[in-house]
Design a protein with these regions (language model features):
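Aromatic-residue-lined binding/catalytic grooves and analogous aromatic/hydrophobic interfacial grooves
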Residues: 1-211
């Protein structure tokens, strides 16, 4: 069986979305859980998983004082965060434990992940003057669920292309469009000219910078 996967992080809608599709009907299944090295708790019920946590109030190299913990957490201080996860599917069965969501016997599914923190600027205490990260994350998730995968992807691509399409580069020479990149790299390492590979690297660098 083949599973088709698409991932995107939308800047306009502040949402991380994963689209999964099984070539074989009813053969898609997975479990979603939240893991982090930060201090946090996780709950799950009714196809909704939420993690709430806090960043450390202090982190320093462990060689400063070997007897002291280099990373210090305090639930009443530091930047809070919330992560929400929900699965959307037209088939299969969704179940949950107290800290995970599972999908079985599905053909297609979309996983929506929204995250927010209480950070409210460099000059404000994120614990006492912070934003309501729980409300923000829930608002983002609700909006994304209403938009759906197709619309989110459309808005995401349009937003990205606003920057990417500003520049075009075309170098003279044989582009050899059917030659795979790994073969191009081998030839280039031997000193062969490949203007298409140079163009590809230029655009790849822009892709990473914009992202």
């Amino acid at each position: 069986n083949t599973i088709e996967r698409e991932y995107l992080v939308s800047n306009p809608d502040k949402i991380f979305v994963i689209r999964l599709k099984s070539k074989k009907p009813g053969a898609l299944g997975f479990t979603v859980r939240f893991e982090s090295l930060l201090l946090h708790t996780t709950t799950a019920s009714n196809n909704f998983l939420q993690a709430n946590g806090v960043a450390p109030v202090k982190a320093e190299p462990n060689y400063v004082e070997k007897k002291r913990n280099a990373i210090i957490f305090d639930k009443k201080r530091g930047t809070r965060f919330t992560a929400n996860i929900q699965i959307k599917t037209n088939s299969g069965k969704i179940t949950n434990t107290d800290s995970s969501l599972s999908l079985a016997n599905a053909t297609e599914a979309t996983i929506y992940i929204s995250m927010a923190t209480s950070f409210n600027g460099y000059d404000k205490d994120p614990a006492k003057q912070g934003l309501n990260q729980t409300t923000i994350a829930q608002t983002q998730l609700t909006k994304a669920l209403n938009l759906g995968w197709d619309e989110i992807k459309k808005r995401h691509v349009k937003d990205y292309q606003t920057y990417f399409n500003r520049v075009a580069l075309k170098l003279e020479g044989d582009p050899s469009p059917n030659l795979p990149t790994n073969e191009r790299l081998k030839r280039y390492a031997k000193g062969e000219s490949d203007p298409y590979l140079e163009t590809l690297y230029f655009q790849f660098g822009r892709y990473l910078l914009i992202s």
